[in-house]
């Protein structure tokens, strides 16, 4: 179920504040965040945000196509290592 149309998209206040300060000063630093549920705003385009995947921070460069999506959509939380083949069944 999607968010109510009466409400604005969610973005962590501290994250948005850091982005707006960097836009005002012209800096392009990597910002660490644990807020995977924050929506990407147009002000964030061109910045790199390190999103936490549960183990480490993964840097994500934000482009125009990502606006409206959540930060967590671009960082995987699970690692797929493949299925382990059974060695005894291969001998037959």
Swiss-Prot record:
GO terms for molecular function: rRNA binding; structural constituent of ribosome. Pfam families: Ribosomal_S19. Keywords: Ribonucleoprotein, Ribosomal protein, RNA-binding, rRNA-binding. InterPro entries: Ribosomal_uS19 (IPR002222), Ribosomal_uS19_bac-type (IPR005732), Ribosomal_uS19_CS (IPR020934), Ribosomal_uS19_SF (IPR023575). PROSITE patterns: RIBOSOMAL_S19. GO terms for biological process: ribosomal small subunit assembly; translation. The keyword Ribonucleoprotein applies. SUPFAM superfamilies: Ribosomal protein S19. One of its GO terms (cellular component) is small ribosomal subunit. Belongs to the universal ribosomal protein uS19 family. Protein S19 forms a complex with S13 that binds strongly to the 16S ribosomal RNA. NCBIfam families: rpsS_bact. HAMAP family: Ribosomal_uS19. This is Small ribosomal subunit protein uS19. It comes from Clostridium botulinum (strain Eklund 17B / Type B).
